[in-house]
Design a protein with these regions (language model features):
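N-terminal secretory/targeting leader peptides
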Residues: 28-149, 159, 168-169, 174-364
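Gram-positive cell-envelope targeting signals
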Residues: 1-47
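Short, compositionally biased "basic patch" segments
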Residues: 163-164
Length: 364
């Protein structure tokens, strides 16, 4: 299990952190790796000492942040900066520990954990949130979000704010910030797809607990296989799946990259992530530190967005350099696929939203 977490540099502080973390993370005995820079740790240690705030004091709060992403992913890099700045600006009173690479399970585990309070924070896809609130299906509707800018407009809109507020009241989970995962395409080992009919019979991995993806590819007569992301490499290698749908950055920063032969540019959906926190735990933090936490979340969401926009071309280039051939679908085939996916999933909206909701979001 790989863990990254915040800690002070001074020996006395580090010992206290280790003891405190051991109590919180019962059963997690692997070596811990501090990721706070030495300069930050020294400055925070001095500041905390002057303020009388020490690790282990009741004023010190440790927040576990779980993610399926690997450390190379831009969103996770931004979260590391977020955690460090929160640690520094609160003089060590808030210590955010990042558990990457599915080390605490998959997204379903995180959502269960954050409601139970065993995981305080997580970064999960909006598609995964559909399992506990069907309203999040809107984020993944085929062809609805065709650009990062449109996604941002929706997230900042009154429509989305109302959705997130209702979600917070019902679930006890607050969204702190939006992160971009990007356009989703289909990635295949050996098999090729040029037409909608070519999906028939293909075993395609979809994320666990995401009904919209299931409906989409069942509409194309593919055999959908729900799997955690961490199981995909072995599933490809064994032939258990023929491929998966995902964004380019996830593929090139995983060990799947050496097993995939083709990228089919379906561009069927746009993938987004939300940084979530347990509302009850957030409200236990002092108002000043709570403001620091929420402001830093928004700041590093913006940083991650700029990095995402700058890094997309490099990610696609990395896929090409790895020997992955891109299959550009003819526009009429791409349109047929999207229409098929939309037809299969739009009925989900009718059971959840008032008439005209899709069109209202589409017009943003």
């Amino acid at each position: 299990m790989k863990k990254q977490f915040r800690a002070g540099a001074a020996a006395g502080l580090l010992a206290a952190v280790s003891l405190f973390s051991a109590v919180l993370l019962t059963g997690c005995s692997e070596e811990k790796k501090p990721v706070v820079s030495a300069e930050t740790a020294e400055a925070v240690t001095e500041s905390a000492s002057e303020a009388g705030v020490w690790p282990g004091d009741e004023n010190r709060i440790v927040l576990k942040l779980a993610s399926t992403l690997s450390p190379e992913m831009r969103a996770l890099n931004a979260l590391s900066g977020f955690a460090e700045e929160v640690f520094r600006e609160t003089s060590g009173r808030i210590d955010i520990q990042i558990y990457d690479s599915s080390s605490l399970g998959d997204q379903v585990d995180y959502l269960n954990g954050i409601r139970q309070g065993t995981v305080e924070m997580c970064l999960v896809s909006t598609a995964a949130l559909e399992a506990i609130d069907p309203h999040f299906v809107i984020f993944g509707m085929p062809g609805l979000f065709t650009s990062a800018e449109k996604v941002n407009r929706f997230y900042e809109s009154d429509i989305c704010r109302e959705l997130l507020d209702e979600f917070r009241q019902k679930s006890g989970i607050r969204s702190l910030a939006l992160f971009h995962d990007g356009i989703r395409n289909v990635w295949l080992k050996e098999a090729r797809v040029y037409r909608a009919e070519d999906f028939a019979g293909l075993r395609l991995r979809i994320p666990t607990g995401v009904r919209i993806r299931e409906k989409e590819f069942q509409a194309l007569k593919a055999e959908v296989v729900p799997l955690p992301l961490s199981d995909c490499s072995a599933a490809l290698q064994s032939g258990y799946i023929d491929g998966l749908e995902n964004n380019v950055e996830t593929i090139v920063n995983s060990d799947m990259i050496g097993q995939i032969d083709y990228q089919v540019k379906t561009e069927h959906a746009y993938s987004t992530l939300l940084l979530l926190i347990n509302e009850q735990i957030l409200m236990q933090i002092s108002e000043n530190d709570r403001n620091i936490l929420t402001d830093c979340a928004r700041k590093y969401s913006g940083i991650a967005f700029q990095q995402y926009m700058e890094g997309q071309e490099a990610a696609y280039r990395a896929a090409e350099q790895a020997g992955i051939e891109t299959i550009e679908l003819e526009e009429k085939e791409k349109r047929r696929i999207r229409e098929s996916l939309l037809s299969a999933t739009k009925e989900m909206l009718e059971d959840i939203f008032p008439e005209g909701f899709y069109e209202k979001v589409d017009a943003l």
